[in-house]
């Protein structure tokens, strides 16, 4: 495809290589060994990629990267690693400052890398790609941006959440599918049957769970509240936070949430829905993939619907998976060219198709592609415009992700539900924790 970056801003690599070869032809090799070999030696890029739990998609992208290398005369050293493999390697890289040339960057590390100045600016690439397919979705465009409008990464795909509902249970009670969070509570009470090990709502609230942060934050935005303000300062102390805590507590007190909910990890609500002990829960497409491949009977009893709305609208806290180029690279221009190539729509399309719906598009018009017209997948695609990064309504900063990783919202919720604290006391503790994370990064 044709790219739109200005040639005056970056000379294409092939021209640079050609010029180098012409110069080398006119200049005698320096004394000593290796003069001729050095002039023709291929540049090499070390690239770290992450597994996506969809091997076909991983293979598709690996092939794209290798094909780009062959076409541009670049040696590719590509390592695609699981989370367990990546964690120690990233720890070593951070400690030694010996980074790959470019990589899929861990979400918690991206803002820190930006703050520490170890990434190459990607604004030019982002501007070029943003001209394609209707431009990036709002969340994808903002995920690696700083307050000065500069970009430091390029998005590859996103994830969002939907609501899974036991429509057969609702039909037994003559109830319509929920549109709002108030509907969720009403329905949960109607279908609740704890004597037979069935609870109306599989609400995520476990402190070892990232899903708990996603769920609470999505509901908080829907109720008109926010964890952080536009400038990245704590904003949890609000009437909207108190309203939401009261709402969830009413569900907890009514017994419509499984009593072991506070102990759930990220797989807790998946297991609860898949074992048919809850009537509703939020999740990514992972439950859908399980039902389609492992439990057709439960799939037929399930409705996949958008996240319920609150007084302020419909929101979900999602993730935007980013790649970046490290300033330690000897070939930053090559890395930027590679990212512009593999994250253009014509390369992402086969990657998404190979993923079978696991990865959601980062371009607006790609949400209209045929693969997203399947009814269940379409619900996922339709939630993308409602998906926001963790720092919403501002930018996602290092302190915001530190607080996220510390499960600050889930801890606050459990203070109220499990420990019996008042809203004011729980909010005060959470606000102090948020302020601590904020202050640490201002020093």
Would you name each region that the model predicts?
Residues 123-136, 205-208, 223-243, 293-300, ...:
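Short, solvent-exposed loop/beta-turn-alpha elements that line the ligand-binding surface or hinge
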Residues 2-6, 18, 26-118, 126-134, ...:
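Conserved N-terminal structural module of periplasmic/extracytoplasmic solute-binding proteins
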Residues 58-62, 84-121, 133-153, 163-164, ...:
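Pocket-flanking alpha-helical
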């Amino acid at each position: 495809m044709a790219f739109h970056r200005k040639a005056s801003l970056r000379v294409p690599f092939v021209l640079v290589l050609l010029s180098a070869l012409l110069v080398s032809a006119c200049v005698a090799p320096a004394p000593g060994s290796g003069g001729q070999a050095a002039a023709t030696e291929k540049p090499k890029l070390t690239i770290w990629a992450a597994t996506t739990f969809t091997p076909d998609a991983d293979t598709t992208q690996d092939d794209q990267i290798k094909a780009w290398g062959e076409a541009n005369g670049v040696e590719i050293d590509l390592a695609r690693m699981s989370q367990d493999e990546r964690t120690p390697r990233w720890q070593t890289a951070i400690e030694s400052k010996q980074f790959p040339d470019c990589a899929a960057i861990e979400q918690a590390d991206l803002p820190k890398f930006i703050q520490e100045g170890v990434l190459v600016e990607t604004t030019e690439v982002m501007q070029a790609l943003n001209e394609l397919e209707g431009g990036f979705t709002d969340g994808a465009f903002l995920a690696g941006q700083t307050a000065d409008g500069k970009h430091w990464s390029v998005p590859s795909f996103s994830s969002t959440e939907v609501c899974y509902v036991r429509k057969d249970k609702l039909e037994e009670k003559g109830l319509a599918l929920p549109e709002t969070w108030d509907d969720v509570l009403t329905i949960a009470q109607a279908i609740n049957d704890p004597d037979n090990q069935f609870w109306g709502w599989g609400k995520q609230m476990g402190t070892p769970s990232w899903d708990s942060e996603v769920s609470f934050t999505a509901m908080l935005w829907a109720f008109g509240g926010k964890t952080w303000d536009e400038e990245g300062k704590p904003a949890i102390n609000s009437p909207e936070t108190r309203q939401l805590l009261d709402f969830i507590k009413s569900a907890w007190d009514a017994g419509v949430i499984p009593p072991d909910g506070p102990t759930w990890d990220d797989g807790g609500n998946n297991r609860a829905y898949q074992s048919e002990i809850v009537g509703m829960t939020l999740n990514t497409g992972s439950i859908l993939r399980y039902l389609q491949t492992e439990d057709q009977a439960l799939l037929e009893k399930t409705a996949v619907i958008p996240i319920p709305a609150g007084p302020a609208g419909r929101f979900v806290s999602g993730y935007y998976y980013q790649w970046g180029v490290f300033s330690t690279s000897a070939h930053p221009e090559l890395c930027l060219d590679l990212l512009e190539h593999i994250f253009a729509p014509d390369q992402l399309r086969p990657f998404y198709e190979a993923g079978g719906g696991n990865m959601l598009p980062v371009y607006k018009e790609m949400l209209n592609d045929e693969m997203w017209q399947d009814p269940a997948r379409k619900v996922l695609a339709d939630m993308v415009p409602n998906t926001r990064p963790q720092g919403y309504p501002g930018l996602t900063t290092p302190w915001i992700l530190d607080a996220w990783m510390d499960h600050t919202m889930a801890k606050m919720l459990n203070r109220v539900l499990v420990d019996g604290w008042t809203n004011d006391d729980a909010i005060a503790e959470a606000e102090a924790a948020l302020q601590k994370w904020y202050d640490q990064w201002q020093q």
